[in-house]
């Protein structure tokens, strides 16, 4: 059983991706990343501003970038044009960290601040441009099977459908659509946003998702380091369960012990 997780030609061992936002302290963020066992860490490039630049710079310095792969993301970008600019900035930051061959980007185009649903047209437009530039594009999308296929067709290296509204902890509101995306996709499906507890991470892995991205569920819980470890175990369990193959669902009962050679029949 091949346990490696591949995006484009890059192999990763962990199928859990961890975000770096909303932690209460640098130490908590660093310890959570370590406890998660992740290989990929995502950082919101657009949200590096005067208020948090010290935190982000310090976090970047704390992380061993020879061990972790940076996934720059364009969170906070409201248009395709803005997302394209931020993607290029993220690529430069990756190079400065020594990852000269890192052209990954988690593409987010979100025009409204209240519900934070991604713009499908803006995402498609930005993705097409970035793919032509040579980026490994991982678009964050609503759980729309048609859009997921269109993004795959233009050359995106993965798709990232949301489970529910980002940061909401509402869980798996769109599980049926995600299942369709998983069944139809020839690129990795990474479920992102809305997952609140480890059992939900396990469930999406059980239906065949390739990986899960978690941020708020870890960063904002009572004990982030413990939750990061729980998510690590949950994702691994879900992957193993899917690989093992569940039993068929039946409409009737069936005993687990044999009916022959029972006491009284011997």
From Swiss-Prot:
The keyword Plastid applies. Pathway: Cofactor biosynthesis; thiamine diphosphate biosynthesis. It is found in: Plastid, Chloroplast. It is an enzyme of class 2 (transferase). The keyword Repeat does not apply. The active site is at 106 (schiff-base intermediate with dxp). It holds the Pfam family ThiG. It catalyses: [ThiS sulfur-carrier protein]-C-terminal-Gly-aminoethanethioate + 2-iminoacetate + 1-deoxy-D-xylulose 5-phosphate = [ThiS sulfur-carrier protein]-C-terminal Gly-Gly + 2-[(2R,5Z)-2-carboxy-4-methylthiazol-5(2H)-ylidene]ethyl phosphate + 2 H2O + H(+). Its main location: plastid. One of its GO terms (molecular function) is thiazole synthase activity. Homotetramer. Forms heterodimers with either ThiH or ThiS. This is Thiazole synthase. The lineage of its organism: Eukaryota, Rhodophyta, Bangiophyceae, Cyanidiales, Cyanidiaceae. The gene is thiG.
């Amino acid at each position: 059983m091949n346990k490696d997780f591949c995006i484009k030609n890059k192999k990763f061992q962990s199928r859990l991706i961890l975000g770096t936002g909303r932690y209460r302290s640098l130490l908590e963020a660093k310890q959570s990343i370590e406890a998660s066992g992740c290989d990929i860490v995502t950082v919101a490039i657009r949200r590096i501003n005067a208020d948090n630049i010290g935190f982000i710079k310090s976090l970047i310095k704390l992380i061993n970038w020879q061990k972790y792969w940076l996934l720059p993301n364009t969170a906070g970008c409201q248009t395709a044009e803005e997302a394209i600019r931020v993607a290029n900035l993220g690529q430069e930051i990756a190079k400065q960290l020594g990852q000269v061959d890192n052209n990954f980007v988690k593409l987010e185009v979100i025009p409204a601040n209240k519900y934070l649903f991604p713009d499908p047209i803006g995402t498609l437009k930005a993705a097409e441009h970035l793919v032509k530039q040579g980026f490994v594009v991982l678009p964050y999308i609503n759980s729309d099977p048609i859009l997921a296929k269109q993004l795959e067709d233009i050359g995106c290296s993965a798709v990232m459908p949301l489970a529910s509204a980002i940061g909401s902890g509402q869980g798996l509101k769109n599980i049926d659509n995600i299942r369709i995306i998983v069944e139809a996709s020839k690129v990795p499906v990474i479920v992102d946003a809305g997952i609140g507890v480890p059992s939900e991470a396990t469930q999406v892995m059980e239906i065949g998702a390739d990986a899960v991205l978690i941020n708020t569920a870890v960063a904002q819980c009572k004990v982030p380091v413990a939750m990061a470890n729980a998510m690590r175990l949950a994702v691994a369990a879900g992957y193993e369960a899917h690989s093992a193959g569940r039993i068929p669902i039946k409409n009737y009962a069936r005993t687990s012990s044999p009916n022959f050679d029972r006491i009284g029949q011997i």
